[in-house]
Design a protein with these regions (language model features):
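Short, small-residue-biased leader/transition segments that mark boundaries at the very start
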Residues: 1-2
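Short, acidic/small-residue loops that bind anionic groups at enzyme active sites
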Residues: 112, 185-186
């Protein structure tokens, strides 16, 4: 459905904004995902919106090439790995039935991952010197901003609030539980 709103002054149109809007239902039952009442098995990729010649700039031709690759492989979904993508990709996904896991740019919330891989000095992920209350407040606002921007895209079925974070500790639970609530409330 297309909604269009115009700001007018007398007979003169000052500005017009249009927004495509769609409705879908998402339900999880055990390990099964249902979209609009139908069971769905996600097949797809965590992708990156970048290219060696243009960097992170959006390019419609590259978007269409990526979409053709997704279709060729039989994928029905994509994850906006590590950061939000251009709204153009979400518009494309809305029109073509792709399901999207929309991710915040919260990468590196796992000090053990880098330290374990590179043998570096181990630091706790959550502490006054690393990931802390200030980080959590900014992270919460990033979640609100992402959901405010993308909530009308029916292709978005999951909000991913972090990429590969520390998740097995009590400190991680204390950090992330309030952020889950932020996402649910947004």
């Amino acid at each position: 459905t297309l909604f269009r709103s115009s700001l007018v002054d007398g007979d003169q149109v000052i500005d017009t904004y249009q927004q495509v809007f769609g409705v879908r239902t998402i339900r999880v039952d055990g390990a099964r995902l249902f979209v609009n009442g139908e069971p769905v098995h996600l097949t797809g990729f965590g992708m990156h919106e970048d290219h060696q010649t243009i960097g992170k700039a959006h390019n419609d031709a590259l978007m269409l090439r990526d979409a053709a690759c997704l279709e060729w492989i039989g994928a029905n979904s994509l994850r906006t790995s590590h950061y939000p993508y251009s709204e153009r990709i979400l518009d494309y996904a809305d029109r073509h039935g792709l399901l999207v896991i929309d991710e915040t740019p919260a990468v590196g919330i796992n000090m053990g991952l880098g330290g374990g891989i590179f043998g570096a000095q181990g630091y706790p992920t959550f502490s006054a010197e690393t990931i802390n209350d200030k980080t959590q407040k900014v992270h919460a606002q990033v979640i609100r901003d992402l959901i405010a921007r993308d909530k009308n895209h029916p292709s978005v079925i999951i909000w991913s609030i972090a990429n590969e974070p520390e998740s097995e500790t009590e400190a991680a639970e204390n950090y992330f539980l309030p952020l889950f609530d932020v996402a649910r409330a947004a």
